[in-house]
Amino acid sequence: MGRSLKKGPFCDEHLMKKIEKLNATGQKQVIKTWSRRSTIFPQFVGHTIAVYDGRKHVPVYITEDMVGHKLGEFAPTRTFRGHAGDDKKTKR
């Protein structure tokens, strides 16, 4: 289930303040955040946000297509190493 329309989208206040401050000064710098739950707003477009994946901060450049999604969607927490190889080829 998605979030109620009555409530509106969620974004951590500290992250929103940092973005608004950068937009006011016109600066572009990487913002470190642990807030994977925050929704991406149109004000974020053009900024790079380093989202924590549990081990390191993954830099995510925000584009228009990402608006409405969560920051955590773009910083995977699990590393996929691939499925087991096919043993049929090695037996021959």
From Swiss-Prot:
Organism equals Geobacillus kaustophilus (strain HTA426)
Q: What does this protein do?
A: Protein S19 forms a complex with S13 that binds strongly to the 16S ribosomal RNA.
Does the record's keyword annotation contain Transport? no
Q: Which family does it belong to?
A: Belongs to the universal ribosomal protein uS19 family.
Superkingdom: Bacteria
Q: Which PROSITE patterns match?
A: RIBOSOMAL_S19
Q: Name one GO biological process term.
A: ribosomal small subunit assembly
Q: Which GO terms describe its cellular component?
A: cytoplasm; small ribosomal subunit
Write the lineage as a comma-separated list. Answer: Bacteria, Bacillati, Bacillota, Bacilli, Bacillales
**Entry keyword annotation includes Ribonucleoprotein:** yes
Q: What is the official name of this protein in its record?
A: Small ribosomal subunit protein uS19
The cross-references to SUPFAM superfamilies, in alphabetical order and at most eight, read:
Ribosomal protein S19
Keyword annotations = Ribonucleoprotein, Ribosomal protein, RNA-binding, rRNA-binding
A GO molecular function term, named singly, is: rRNA binding
